[in-house]
Curated annotation (Swiss-Prot):
This protein's name: tRNA dimethylallyltransferase
Family from the record: Belongs to the IPP transferase family.
E.C. numbers: 2.5.1.75
Residue numbers binding ATP: G13, P14, T15, A16, S17, G18, K19, T20
Site features described as Interaction with substrate tRNA, chain residue numbers: S104
Role of this protein: Catalyzes the transfer of a dimethylallyl group onto the adenine at position 37 in tRNAs that read codons beginning with uridine, leading to the formation of N6-(dimethylallyl)adenosine (i(6)A).
Catalytic activity: adenosine(37) in tRNA + dimethylallyl diphosphate = N(6)-dimethylallyladenosine(37) in tRNA + diphosphate
GO BP of this protein: tRNA modification
Organism: Parasynechococcus marenigrum (strain WH8102)
Recorded superkingdom: Bacteria
Residue span of region Interaction with substrate tRNA: 38-41
Keywords: ATP-binding, Magnesium, Nucleotide-binding, Transferase, tRNA processing
Assembly and oligomerization: Monomer.
């Protein structure tokens, strides 16, 4: 009798949907570590602004693929896959299962469908030029040159915008036309969270970020890596930086962070519904539902 392929469980959902709390419960039930698939949590020193699992949570359940690089060392999708795939394989070999958790849709899609992005090494000089141009110019440029990539990449996502332009410059072809896919040797069970009160949860998340020290973390990052660090233009950090520079007050920073987060969550929802087929878990009973689905897939 043929042995079934090992099982990869993915827990996905928009930001502030409760993935961290549920992932800890599932991980403890199954005695599994959590494999991070949140693109900003890959970077060191970005803890508060990315709502990275706390030291207490990481002591409770081991986490992989956190704090891989310094913030001034961008990680390409291909580099992330090179780190993530062996990590998944190790868990599958030792435990027969792996648990992926995150809201970065493209990163999840790459791991679950075997998407292979073009193998283009980083172009340091080009990245410097693009940083000098600024995201306000670079993203419209990408939309013109590669409309497919431009539609998928958020206007404030300088890291992925630069990467798409980098591939276009190096190969002469849009990044969106070069990706191929080879299905990985494992089964995938996708579990999704999308609570009805997400707007309220996002406001609470924003309040928590600022009370937990987002502004101080931003100040330290700016002093160490420079205010032009692309990751300091992402949600939360961009507003905290303007607050530090005196161009925005606290009330406006809070409001804009909440607004940008809600816009981002809307894009995440669209991506997950178009690119994935998760079992959407109902609030209040999500843990029981998740465990039932997992047990069914293990039979």
């Amino acid at each position: 009798m043929t042995q079934p392929e090992p099982l990869v469980i993915t827990l996905l959902g928009p930001t502030a949907s409760g993935k961290t709390a549920l992932s800890l419960e599932i991980a403890e039930r199954l005695n599994l570590p959590v494999i991070n698939v949140d693109s900003r949590q890959l970077y060191r020193e970005m803890t508060v602004g990315t709502a990275k699992p706390t030291a207490e949570q990481r002591a409770r359940v081991p986490h992989h693929l956190l704090d891989l690089r310094n913030p001034d060392q961008p990680i390409t999708l291909q580099e992330f896959q090179a780190e993530a795939e062996p990590c998944i394989q190790r868990e599958l070999q030792s435990r027969g299962m792996a648990l992926l958790v995150g809201g970065s849709g493209l990163y999840l899609k790459a791991l679950t469908s075997g998407l292979k992005p073009p193998a283009v090494p980083p172009q340091a000089q080009l990245r410097e030029q693009l940083s000098q141009l600024g995201q306000a110019i670079c993203h419209p440029l990408l939309q013109q040159a590669d409309p497919t990539a431009g539609a998928k990449i958020a206007p404030a996502d300088a890291v992925r915008t630069q990467r798409a332009l980098e591939v276009l410059y190096a190969t002469g072809r849009p990044m969106s036309s070069q990706a191929t896919a080879t299905p990985p040797p494992w089964r995938v069970l996708e579990l999704g969270l999308d609570p009805a009160n997400l707007r309220q949860r996002i406001q609470q998340r924003t309040d928590q970020l600022y009370s937990d020290g987002l502004v101080e973390e931003t100040r330290q990052l700016s002093e160490r890596y420079g205010a032009d660090l692309p990751l300091l233009q992402t949600i939360g950090y961009g507003e905290a930086l303007q607050l530090l520079e005196g161009t925005m007050n606290q009330a406006k920073a809070n409001r804009i962070t909440t607004q940008r987060t809600r816009q981002f969550a809307k894009r995440q929802r669209t991506w997950f519904r178009r690119q994935h087929q998760p079992h959407w878990l109902a609030p209040a009973t999500e843990l029981d539902q998740a465990m039932t689905l997992i047990e069914q897939h293990l039979r």
